[in-house]
Amino acid sequence: MIRRSIVSFPTMKLKQLESYLSQVAPFENPQYELEQYPTSAHLASRMIFTAANSFEDIVDKHVLDLGTGTAMLGIASVIMGAGHVLGIDVDPGALATAAENLRVVEAEEEMELLHSNVEHISLRPGSFDTVVMNPPFGTRTSGADTMFLNKAFEVATHAVYSMHKSSTREFVLAQGASKGFRGEVDLVRFERIEPLPTDEKEEEKSEAIVF
């Protein structure tokens, strides 16, 4: 089990993180219309490890896991030293699994879960340092990916880590630019340029964009 008190974040190895994340249970009943494709421990560990060590976007940060599902990215953020994590999802079944995952890895104090629709939730602009997410591709509900991106750009003060189909790369980067974020195709990371005033989703078909 994972306890922050016994995990040494500065010396955490990538393979260690992936091993911890292998404890995270996947969706019990994936909702096709919500495009609930699982985020593998392999991919999640690489995204959050990079965010923490290459960009300093996780340790002691206020992190939002948008569309958290079973909390894979949120738990990874906790393990890597996030100050606090909020996970939001519209599916109560997924949140029940997420809550059990938090119990299993003993991360209930560090991560909070909220049942809400991303489109309608009211979050104060700039209320999170970093947003991490594996959003819908928008293949079932047109514009779903844009909705998640817009909410992420609205609430992140510094960086957004998001997974998308490589075929939508230019569109996603343009979305970030329109909101004042510069994106890098990496894993993808978006960094704010100016301060505020069934696994269809395979790794070979997706890439992490960092803003």
Predicted regions and their residues:
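Class I S-adenosyl-L-methionine-dependent methyltransferase catalytic core
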Residues: 2-211
